[in-house]
């Protein structure tokens, strides 16, 4: 019997492969446990169709991330913080403050966990890197000013 593997099966193959197996193994184990489906023409066509849709969605998502990367590269956020008598910041600028300023000033929401920077403790222009997903990274600037 031919089966289409839905999940990786040790010593048999990876998800998406069509394998020839004994009827009992296919029916009583692979199909019963949800590791595979019988490889009929309809199942194979649906699998190919789903794979094409998934690839199209991935291309669309990557295109949107590239567009966001381009938008972010043009941004310079302005953040005002109180400073001490010697000109140093009180506490610094955190990822949370950067994410909030990005949302307020540019209407772009980014999770603070995707920001790749430490707390900034000095005034001036700083570069912030953002992990957008699918190995796409963007950079934008923040300008920290005294209040």
Curated annotation (Swiss-Prot):
Q: Which GO terms describe its molecular function?
A: rRNA binding; structural constituent of ribosome
- Which superkingdom, per the lineage? Bacteria
One GO CC annotation, please?
Answer: ribosome
Query: Which SUPFAM superfamilies does this chain map to?
Result: L9 N-domain-like, Ribosomal protein L9 C-domain
Its keywords, alphabetically, are: Ribonucleoprotein, Ribosomal protein, RNA-binding, rRNA-binding
Look up keyword RNA-binding and say if it applies: yes
User: Which Pfam families does the annotation name?
Assistant: Ribosomal_L9_C (PF03948), Ribosomal_L9_N (PF01281)
InterPro entries reported in the protein's UniProt record: Ribosomal_bL9, Ribosomal_bL9/RNase_H1_N, Ribosomal_bL9_bac/chp, Ribosomal_bL9_C, Ribosomal_bL9_C_sf, Ribosomal_bL9_N, Ribosomal_bL9_N_sf
GO terms classed as biological process:
translation
Q: Which PANTHER family match?
A: 50S RIBOSOMAL PROTEIN L9
What family name appears in the similarity comment? Answer: Belongs to the bacterial ribosomal protein bL9 family.
**Which HAMAP family does this entry report, sorted A to Z?**
Ribosomal_bL9
> What function is annotated for this protein?
Binds to the 23S rRNA.
Q: What name goes with this protein?
A: Large ribosomal subunit protein bL9
* Naturally occurring in which organism (per UniProt): Campylobacter jejuni subsp. jejuni serotype O:23/36 (strain 81-176)
